[in-house]
Amino acid sequence: MRIGMICPYSFDVPGGVQSHVLQLAEVMRARGQQVRVLAPASPDVSLPEYVVSAGRAIPIPYNGSVARLQFSPAVHSRVRRWLVDGDFDVLHLHEPNAPSLSMWALRVAEGPIVATFHTSTTKSLTLSVFQGVLRPWHEKIIGRIAVSDLARRWQMEALGSDAVEIPNGVNVDSLSSAPQLAGYPRLGKTVLFLGRYDEPRKGMSVLLDALPGVMECFDDVQLLIVGRGDEEQLRSQAGGLVEHIRFLGQVDDAGKAAAMRSADVYCAPNIGGESFGIVLVEAMAAGTPVVASDLDAFRRVLRDGEVGHLVPAGDSAALADALVALLRNDVLRERYVAAGAEAVRRYDWSVVASQIMRVYETVATSGSKVQVAS
């Protein structure tokens, strides 16, 4: 099967959707499918041979963050040319509501179209502005996928259409067997934060407020930070706590897995804006117990607290208590690790890719190819 995938977000920087698209493409290619990917990317970015760059992206506020998207008249011709050259049996669009490549492709493409909805934002400027235009375009989508129940419910409420729920995937074996960072695990214990730490919704300020409470019981605890952000600003914000912080910066998938394998606890202090919780799944696959905010998306991944510790979002005192409880209790951590290992099986790419493939096969039953509207 010839499969065309479109990612709206730039490959210049790592992100959940970008990673999902690349990993799905790799799994499908390993299964013998012919896959091509179109995504924004700068000329100096190294891309797999099956990825075609649609050109540079620009920062645009979207879904409570700043996403690097591509939305200009020049994109129209690039998308059309890629679709014609691809001769695809199925076109798989990711985030067709984002003002970028997927939206352009949905405008011009016809035939076997699949779309995955990753976000569950309840307030979308893009949707409010383009809703009248988007609805008829969305009628072209034959197979709809939502990565979570939240994303599915949002799609039903905002667009009046339903979707099959298929979660994001992870490579469980790769994460569980990753090597640890040199010098880890530490005797003084390590708490891992992963994400863009200067985005308020990621909750770094809550974690910093909780850290002194953790230090009362573990005076040599280290906060290991992986991700992008203004390091100097965070150092200033942390004050005297900075001696207990190690910045790894932006790392590749192997570095992320190593960091997860090296931590005693993974902490997700997010305060909102999450539709899934892929990093929680990755941490559990790596064998690291999780403490996370009690957001709907995280609660579903952690099975209402059965496979990870949930705390009220924004409550630094509760977060400190939860971190201390796990760091001082080896038996509790081991219980969460064992429960997490069982829970992540449904997220392994061997399962997720098969579910997505069934959607492809369903929409392609007519035998018609993806066409470009005249």
Swiss-Prot record:
Organism: Mycobacterium leprae (strain TN)
A Pfam family per the record: Glyco_transf_4
EC number assigned by the record: 2.4.1.345
Entry-linked InterPro entries: Glyco_trans_4-like_N, Glycosyltransferase_grp1
Binding residues annotated for GDP-alpha-D-mannose, in chain numbering: 9, 16, 196, 201-202, 251-253, 256, 274-278, 282
Metabolic or biological pathway: Phospholipid metabolism; phosphatidylinositol metabolism
Binding sites annotated in the UniProt record for a 1,2-diacyl-sn-glycero-3-phospho-(1D-myo-inositol): 18, 62-63, 68
Membrane topology of the entry: Peripheral membrane protein
Disulfide partners: none
Gene3D superfamilies linked: Glycogen Phosphorylase B
Keyword field contains Transmembrane helix: no
Compartmental location: Cell membrane
Protein name per its UniProtKB record: Phosphatidyl-myo-inositol mannosyltransferase
Main location: membrane
Catalytic activity: a 1,2-diacyl-sn-glycero-3-phospho-(1D-myo-inositol) + GDP-alpha-D-mannose = a 1,2-diacyl-sn-glycero-3-phospho-[alpha-D-mannopyranosyl-(1<->6)-D-myo-inositol] + GDP + H(+)
Similarity field: Belongs to the glycosyltransferase group 1 family. Glycosyltransferase 4 subfamily.
Protein purpose: Involved in the biosynthesis of phosphatidyl-myo-inositol mannosides (PIM) which are early precursors in the biosynthesis of lipomannans (LM) and lipoarabinomannans (LAM). Catalyzes the addition of a mannosyl residue from GDP-D-mannose (GDP-Man) to the position 2 of the carrier lipid phosphatidyl-myo-inositol (PI) to generate a phosphatidyl-myo-inositol bearing an alpha-1,2-linked mannose residue (PIM1).
One of the record's GO cellular component terms: plasma membrane
Entry keyword Nucleotidyltransferase: no
Keyword vocabulary terms for this entry: Cell membrane, Glycosyltransferase, Lipid biosynthesis, Lipid metabolism, Magnesium, Membrane, Phospholipid biosynthesis, Phospholipid metabolism, Transferase
Quaternary state and interactors: Monomer.
Cofactor (UniProt): Mg(2+)
